[in-house]
């Protein structure tokens, strides 16, 4: 039984069938020769695979979601004396019977879910890498650029958009003593969102932040005059960029995120 040939047939990439076959074959002392046949869309290809499998005395394992394709392969393989094992079909049928729901019969669903997962991870890593203006190069690479003074929820909003919307977000803090990066004036204004907050609200947030750190709430960081200076600087920069401004004074992260996503969708940027 050394090098037993197994043809893995799929209407998508064939990763699911490949993994199952390797897991099963791992229980035996012989090494299988697994040959993947992906993206099968017609019975002609199935007929050809059956013929080759017969000549090689091979086994066929398949994941075909469409019932007519599954039935064709099983029937024709049996006629030729070729063993064909349906990996996913019986489970789909059983789930349909139990739930009463009709399957979509749509190939490649698992792969698309995997792709969405990796997009999410990529977006989260992007948000971490380009958080708080760490690297201005991220501004030109980002889907969204958040701009605001300290404590306007730039970081949690970046993470929320990355995790839930798979958007790559860079955020840029503004302070009067530091010139904004030039990239901020080069990126499309439609990608930029200024996060505005009232002085009183920001004063309260910063005082609470200082208390949580065991520091005096009388520090310059929470001084109302300093806060107003920062907000004035923010408005000057935003006026130059001419981007959309969102008042986050009394908004939850989810609310602000929805405003941004709706704006992006309306612009048909993605």
From Swiss-Prot:
Any one Gene Ontology molecular-function term assigned to this protein's record: ATP binding
Where do the coiled-coil regions begin and end? none
Q: What is its EC number?
A: 2.7.11.32, 2.7.4.27
- Identify the keywords attached in UniProt to this record, alphabetized: Kinase, Nucleotide-binding, Serine/threonine-protein kinase, Transferase
Domain of life (superkingdom): Bacteria
Which InterPro entries does its entry note?
Kinase-pyrophosphorylase, PPDK_reg
Q: Answer whether the UniProt record assigns the keyword Transferase to this protein.
A: yes
What chemistry does it catalyse, as a reaction equation?
A: N(tele)-phospho-L-histidyl/L-threonyl-[pyruvate, phosphate dikinase] + ADP = N(tele)-phospho-L-histidyl/O-phospho-L-threonyl-[pyruvate, phosphate dikinase] + AMP + H(+); N(tele)-phospho-L-histidyl/O-phospho-L-threonyl-[pyruvate, phosphate dikinase] + phosphate + H(+) = N(tele)-phospho-L-histidyl/L-threonyl-[pyruvate, phosphate dikinase] + diphosphate
User: What positions does the entry give for ADP binding?
Assistant: 148-155
- Top EC class for this record: transferase
Q: Does the keyword Nucleotide-binding apply?
A: yes
The family annotation for this protein states:
Belongs to the pyruvate, phosphate/water dikinase regulatory protein family. PDRP subfamily.
**HAMAP family noted in UniProt:** PDRP (MF_00921)
What is the annotated role of this protein in its UniProt record? Bifunctional serine/threonine kinase and phosphorylase involved in the regulation of the pyruvate, phosphate dikinase (PPDK) by catalyzing its phosphorylation/dephosphorylation.
Q: What protein name applies here?
A: Putative pyruvate, phosphate dikinase regulatory protein
Species this chain originates from: Bacillus cereus (strain ATCC 14579 / DSM 31 / CCUG 7414 / JCM 2152 / NBRC 15305 / NCIMB 9373 / NCTC 2599 / NRRL B-3711)
């Amino acid at each position: 039984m050394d090098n037993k040939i197994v043809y893995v047939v799929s209407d998508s990439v064939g990763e699911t069938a490949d993994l199952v076959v390797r897991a099963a074959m791992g229980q035996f002392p012989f090494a299988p020769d697994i040959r993947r046949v992906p993206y099968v869309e017609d019975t002609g290809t199935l007929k050809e695979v059956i013929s080759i499998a017969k000549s090689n005395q091979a086994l066929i394992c398949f994941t075909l979601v469409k019932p007519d394709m599954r039935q064709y392969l099983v029937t024709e393989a049996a006629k030729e004396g070729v063993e064909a094992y349906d990996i996913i079909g019986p489970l789909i049928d059983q789930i349909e019977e139990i739930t009463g729901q009709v399957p979509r019969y749509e190939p490649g669903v698992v792969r698309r879910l995997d792709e969405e997962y990796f997009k999410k991870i990529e977006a989260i890593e992007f948000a971490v890498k380009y958080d708080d203006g760490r690297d201005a190069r991220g501004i030109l690479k980002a889907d969204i650029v958040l701009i605001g003074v300290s404590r306007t929820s730039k970081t949690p909003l970046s993470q929320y958009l990355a995790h839930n919307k798979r958007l790559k977000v860079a955020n840029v803090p503004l302070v009067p003593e530091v010139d904004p990066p030039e990239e901020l004036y080069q990126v499309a204004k439609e990608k930029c969102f200024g996060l505005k907050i009232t002085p009183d609200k920001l004063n309260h947030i910063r005082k609470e932040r200082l208390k949580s750190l065991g520091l005096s709430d009388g520090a310059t960081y929470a001084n109302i005059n300093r806060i107003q200076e920062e907000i004035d600087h923010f408005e000057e920069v935003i006026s130059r960029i001419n981007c959309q401004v969102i008042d986050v004074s009394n908004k939850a992260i989810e609310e602000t995120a929805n405003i941004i996503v709706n704006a992006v969708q309306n612009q048909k940027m993605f």
